[in-house]
Amino acid sequence: MARSTTSLFALSLVASAFARVVDYGFDVANGAVAPDGVTRNAVLVNGRFPGPLITANKGDTLKITVRNKLSDPTMRRSTTIHWHGLLQHRTAEEDGPAFVTQCPIPPQESYTYTMPLGEQTGTYWYHSHLSSQYVDGLRGPIVIYDPHDPYRNYYDVDDERTVFTLADWYHTPSEAIIATHDVLKTIPDSGTINGKGKYDPASANTNNTTLENLYTLKVKRGKRYRLRIINASAIASFRFGVQGHKCTIIEADGVLTKPIEVDAFDILAGQRYSCILKADQDPDSYWINAPITNVLNTNVQALLVYEDDKRPTHYPWKPFLTWKISNEIIQYWQHKHGSHGHKGKGHHHKVRAIGGVSGLSSRVKSRASDLSKKAVELAAALVAGEAELDKRQNEDNSTIVLDETKLIALVQPGAPGGSRPADVVVPLDFGLNFANGLWTINNVSYSPPDVPTLLKILTDKDKVDASDFTADEHTYILPKNQVVELHIKGQALGIVHPLHLHGHAFDVVQFGDNAPNYVNPPRRDVVGVTDAGVRIQFRTDNPGPWFLHCHIDWHLEEGFAMVFAEAPEDIKKGSQSVKPDGQWKKLCEKYEKLPEALQ
């Protein structure tokens, strides 16, 4: 990895007035890794899983050159990278989702993403946005530091050691999982923290877990640490906490929040939190716990070790937090699903390689009649089981778990339109189509277009309208500078769906049946949606084609997505127009010449 800036310490002293271009080089290649003790070939950035930490300062411009060296025929060999949470003002072409904002980068080609960061600060991450490729390892953390952070006097340490990348891990390449048509294969084999974990079924002949298999954060008594926690998973949710220590939440998804002290918090795929931990306990070793809470009984752990403890590093004396998933959830995931259908379009194809709907896209087709009869009953059982489990955890351990609805933005709290009605209201009803096994929004299952949405808009010589997009592109045009409210609800089947909107942080003005909150609602870019639904608001002040999708990657593969074409005429011309360079324009002509095996 190449970087043109000085040390993080020096960066923290540089005011935004001295913003610079921060260069990185990404060699995306296949390589063998064993983060949980089981070796497999993966998709790596600079030979690492997770990929290297990207850091910059407020006001800097990130310039990241991606060199595609992928060669393993069992995995996708083209690639794209999405910079999750970066708003991409006037740089929608750099956002990364294949066939929304770009064509993929072919093997043996390179592409440089250039992204002015503007006023953004906080905790973000990057991942492949081509098919299910990030499942195979292409994911890593991003931190944008603020030299004038309002909370700077509340912590002493905030560096690469305190960044925690939580990730589920699969032993089988994602393409092979899709080809099996078996939903059980979408359950991860293990979980990791900063690329370290354990795979421990009793029947497996794998490495025994040792201290070296666990990530270790060393702390000094009396010091305060800003922990930045990222859920870079394909499906897994975690409950994160540090044994014997409280942590004060100050950031959610890149948005500073008013402080909330908790013992633990739930974090869904795509979400991020910062919390301040004070090392105020007896010098010893303590568990950092992050059990997976939604798909399998797996304890994911790291260690917090006091440097003041003069004894050799050892396991904590106290037991670690265990998690018991309800039998109803286990039954949901282990129900016999049978074979999978598809929408009649190949998984690899010319100039449409988000991979969206093949293979897993109908993983529940054969169980349709059975599950449709049981859906309401099952969903109720799942929700009841989870609620009872949360109650038991809180009562037994007196654990204070973050209530997401209580998050308040530190700067400019309040919905964009205040309490007045939104200018545009968009009802979005999602669910599973039992006839074909596809997830839908408003009865449409997303399929990527033959030409990237952004390219379509930029080359349209007439006014962009709905007729420019096919039905299964599921593209909705939004007018500029309006307050938009999305009413998102549907048939969640007892699962919490992490919904992510590109190009915006939004205000969650209502959770389920709770009273609406326009005064100080939570603000973030990933929100969990259940049957009860949510309502979110944002202002259309960032022209571009922005993806809305479930961040359970397998659900995105099954069509749980749509695109908002925001202010399309302003994308083409004016002060907020998007102006891709020559290398971007050449991606599609290079990609469309590839044989299917190299896509």
From Swiss-Prot:
Binding site for Cu cation 3: H129, H502, H549
Glycosylation site residues: N207, N208, N231, N397, N443
Highest taxon, organism lineage: Eukaryota
Keyword set includes Oxidoreductase: yes
Broad EC category: oxidoreductase
Protein location: Secreted
Cofactor details (free text): Binds 4 Cu cations per monomer.
InterPro entries noted in UniProt: Cu-oxidase-like_N, Cu-oxidase_2nd, Cu-oxidase_C, Cu-oxidase_fam, Cu_oxidase_CS, Cupredoxin
Signal peptide positions on this chain: 1-19
Tissue: In mycelia, at a lower level than LCC4.
Chemical reaction(s) catalysed: 4 hydroquinone + O2 = 4 benzosemiquinone + 2 H2O
Plastocyanin-like domain boundaries: 21-145, 157-307, 450-567
Cofactor entry: Cu cation
Residues annotated for Cu cation 2 binding in this entry: H84, H127, H551
Cystine pairs: C103-C588
Keywords assigned: Copper, Disulfide bond, Glycoprotein, Lignin degradation, Metal-binding, Oxidoreductase, Repeat, Secreted, Signal
Family: Belongs to the multicopper oxidase family.
Function: Lignin degradation and detoxification of lignin-derived products.
Protein name: Laccase-2
Organism: Thanatephorus cucumeris
Lineage of origin: Eukaryota, Fungi, Dikarya, Basidiomycota, Agaricomycotina
Gene: LCC2
